[in-house]
């Protein structure tokens, strides 16, 4: 198939009730600290990042991992002066500055390690990251930050579920690109699409599934995570997916320059 492994890892310890317990176990084991301001792992800790870097480097080498989804960074700055990081400054910027510098160093050394083996590495940063193009020196994609994993617009009554989902995501793009005017290339956006899974509670005909996939491809992103439940797929949907991926790859040199024109989709405006 020509495929390789990827790794989905939450630096802060995930997003569940177990997150504080993970952080406490890491602190008890001497491998990092609990950030009591956000009740998760302190992602600015020097010892934690040293241990994490070793784990990621060793794991990427052993399993030839070429994709890293690093999901969840700093929800709140850690203000504990007893930890192995600095604190203070306006809006806790001393901590924030040192924390991100340590992450930049981690990204740099991790890429150098993979380069020695002539291996590529796609790094995807998700939650609690400023979506600045500056990050693209070190990572490949950044999550939108302004949306839910999945959502449905309520701009029209009794509209098809697929249209509500498409409009929701497009309205988040409008907010990102137009309202907030974030100067971020479409090709490097991670948008959570396509989602067609059991927990999403969506049900599309083959025609709707095709519309959903190709519409998403036209947003211009270079990277898709396929959140698909196999039991919801039939032979036609698998063929549609394959056709979309081939088309998206063949036309990426055009699609990567996608721009949003028109008004806010959630306000029933014409757009493209």
Language-model regions: role of each:
Residues 261-272:
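Carbohydrate-binding surface patches
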Residues 5-9, 68-70, 123-125, 223-226:
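Hydrophobic faces of well-ordered beta-strands that scaffold small-molecule active sites
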Residues 14-50, 54, 100-232:
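Glycan-recognition surfaces
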Residues 1, 59-60, 216:
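Generic structural signal for hydrophobic
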